[in-house]
UniProtKB/Swiss-Prot annotation:
It is found in: Cytoplasm. Monomer. It holds the Pfam family HEAT_EF3_GNC1. It catalyses: ATP + H2O = ADP + phosphate + H(+). This is Elongation factor 3. The gene is TEF3. Its main location: cytoplasm. Its EC number is 3.6.4.-. One of its GO terms (biological process) is cytoplasmic translational termination. Residues 987-999 have a biased composition (Basic and acidic residues). Ribosome-dependent ATPase that functions in cytoplasmic translation elongation. Required for the ATP-dependent release of deacylated tRNA from the ribosomal E-site during protein biosynthesis. Stimulates the eEF1A-dependent binding of aminoacyl-tRNA to the ribosomal A-site, which has reduced affinity for tRNA as long as the E-site is occupied. Assists translation termination by stimulating the release of nascent protein from the ribosome by release factors. It comes from the Eukaryota. Residues 426-641, 667-993 form the ABC transporter domain. Keywords: ATP-binding, Cytoplasm, Elongation factor, Hydrolase, Nucleotide-binding, Protein biosynthesis, Repeat, RNA-binding. It comes from Eremothecium gossypii (strain ATCC 10895 / CBS 109.51 / FGSC 9923 / NRRL Y-1056) (Yeast).
Amino acid sequence: MSDSAQSIKVLGELFEKLSVATAENREATATEIASFLNGNIIEHDVPEEFFKNLTKAVKDKKTAAAALETIAHIANENNLSPSVEPYIVDLVPEVCVKTGDKDKDVQSIASETLLAIVKAIDPVAIKVILPHLTKSLVTTNKWQEKVSVLAAISALVDAAKTQVALRMPELIPVLSEAMWDTKKEVKHAATATMTKATETVDNKDIERFIPELIQCIADPSQVSETVHLLGATTFVAEVTPATLSIMVPLLNRGLAERETSIKRKAAVIIDNMCKLVEDPQVVAPFLEKLLPGLKNNFATIADPEAREVTLRGLKTLRRVGNVSDDDTLPEVSHAGDIVTTRGVLDELTKDTPIAPRFAPVVNYIAAIAADLIDERIIDQQAWFTHVTPYMTVFFHEKQSKEIIDDFRKRAVDNIPVGPNFDDEEDEGEDLCNCEFSLAYGAKILLNKTQLRLKRARRYGLCGPNGAGKSTLMRAIANGQVDGFPTQDECRTVYVEHDIDGTQADTSVLDFVFQGDVGTREVITEKLREFGFSDEMIAMPIMSLSGGWKMKLALARAVLKNADILLLDEPTNHLDTVNVAWLVNYLNTCGITSIIVSHDSGFLDNVCQYIIHYEGLKLRKYKGNLSEFVKKCPTAKSYYELGASDLEFKFPEPGFLEGVKTKQKAIVKVSNMSFQYPGTSKPQIADINFQCSLSSRIAVIGPNGAGKSTLINVLTGELLPTTGEVYTHENCRIAYIKQHAFAHIENHLDKTPSEYIQWRFQTGEDRETMDRANRQINESDAESMNKIFKIDGTPRRIAGIHSRRKFKNTYEYECSFLLGENIGMKSERWVPMMSVDNAWLPRGELIESHSKMVAEVDMKEALASGQFRPLTRKEIEEHCAMLGLEAELVSHSRIRGLSGGQKVKLVLAACTWQRPHLIVLDEPTNYLDRDSLGALSKALKAFEGGVIIITHSAEFTKDLTEEVWAVKDGIMTPSGHNWVSGQGSGPRLEKKEDEGDKFDAMGNKIATGNKKKKLSSAELRKKKKERMKKKKELGDAYVSSDDEF
């Protein structure tokens, strides 16, 4: 098109014709103008003068209808010229005004014209037209104009859904205001447009709640109920500006509600949703709305747990939004602003100035570029497709493309970017290359992350407890990861921690054969390669130690000809010899492996890549664990236990009567041996040791040597076949088994708080009631028939009821059965009255009634004020000492906890009664590196004794001083400092003021201060004062305790 004399003349004639056109012939004139403007005429020019005249015509009452109809025809042309489109959009404000005109005919034509323009424009030019529409909606007082504009916005959603989604943060407030309009027609139209606009919210988590969210905007009284509904939602989908724009109004109101429960749930939703935000710029526009509410609630909410939840949401919002420590809000990126892109374009074309008449086209190009930046479309071809038609209005195509490419590069440079990850891949066959999200229960674990695996590579999977490492492995094995190859395409085998308990009596050979992995001959040969003897192959699985069970599971996996081995803590229970064997096998077998392990040495020796959980993504690092730590120093705790910032703390053990130093033995074993029934020789023999409050003992030895058996006898799980085991009367032992989950596996549907309440509700530890040293067996029953001669009468003990101090030991109150006609057929034993109870010394009772004595000792220890109230607050505080958040303790079921979180729960439950001795069987199983470091430091600081069975020299090297080496059932101690009697060292004092004390039912025990002993002079003075009062008051005198 050209403003040459000829073109000006033609357009002038057409415009004159339009000015005088009647209603019957104006359509024909409009069509003729539209065809001329969009036709093949001279290039590199625009119809500037014509559109100036057309704008005047729209404003003129006489020509408005004809001008509007002309605009509609131009917009409706099949091929709208790029030199015309920007000028058509510039007419939108005038068209909007005419939709509210008094003339109904003009109103109708204007509404149709506005819809035609909206449908005609390039969707990526939304940044030009939408501000015109929203400004009209906010500023006009004419309800007809508002209704027409709302209809145009609805049409815009259909025409440019993706682009409208990015504009939702600025659109929702405008539509919300229209929903509160006093005019019924506007309210209905605004609600319909809001419903239409929310179709751009592509979020499966909240789409079913969108009607309620819209209702909340119209009726704020629905906020509480809607927050409750959303509070139970699992958020797994990526959170976009459109999602936040519809959610933030609700959350903002939820934070301001009066009920603490609503404030808490709003904080939980903010925390969960913000974790799914990919780009800080997505949340940036909403920070000023959400941060003040969270900060205010954290400062004012009285409930500590709700305040903690609020703080967690606040921390997540600050982290995701890149908010500084002083709460200075980050600057919102202006990379996608029209002003910014226009500035870049002006800078590029300053040497080839563009004529002023092209200003609308230049602005249009800047708007298109701004939208492409917002959509993060940086592909060269996409920019050519969208921008070239408009750039060629004033430049030739070749020059246009050169400018566009430079324009793209400079505009893209303004986009805020996260860390630039180098490609850590190398050449090789891809086994898997997929993108997926993963959730467990109500928790999002991974969001739109990529996983790429090569054949014959070994990958270490690292991340904190609860990140979802085992969940990801299990999801892969169960075919629940989107895009991961099926078992037919790629055979994947998951090697779990433990073999199913229902297989306990199955022989090793039969167990492997059940997996349909080959003939018995092939299986037997493979098991021999793995070190199994013929005798072991025929043994039941229950007879294998933990290490051999793990080796069996590995052998079974290998026999399945796996392409990918999923190894979850493969070194658990393995001794150093078998770990070395496993390292060699994995390095030479040529099978792709994904390994979860907290053994840093093992990962160093095996892994070629580390896959690390970072912000709901998996990031791959080339090299082993030590190389990974160099690239990611924040993960230093994976390599050095002491580098962990996490802190655990064990409760201080109570005072033990008669124990005046930390060296005095509280457990002593002499000449002890143990043999399982039906076996040919003792599992352990000739064992001698002692433990004190200062003990730091590492129990080491190969698999099957008898380590766990030794500890089971020490803790009372098993009774010794021969020998003596002495335990201090009030000593409490916390024992965490090798299979730590055995403690909780029957309580998976309880919360951790409910489990601890169940376990200690009677005042005793219900998990220990079935220990062998508390069960009365036949031998015990026989020895309890011992006859005592008391006051000349033969008696048997019926019960032992209480205890009191007697010299340097204790004596116990016993009730009796009286013997009549002993040794005769008519022998009988008659219960005696309680007045006949007698006190017998411990030495006399222990030989025949040791277990009954132990029961009384335990009850006395609990009654002495060592019990803790089973309140939610007390349980949450105790669990927090071992790294479990209140949210998990009181609001999550055990079933939903990760392996590491379950171990922390077991640690918390076992130490609830403030033990004097902590016994840990393979504590490195399941705990992540941070937690292991925290556990190590907590055990060092613990005031009681510690015994650890482990194959991890790294864990015990700086922790233990004494070593019990167990081999072939013989225990050889070294580094011990056993003493007879109290030994040397600082004297232990009983702390009188240890805070509030509670009995076994949780009732507070009132403890008065000891009265000071008065001197003789003070006693005489008191006596004189009493006598004086008595003389003065006579019979009215009543003495008080204070007078003595």
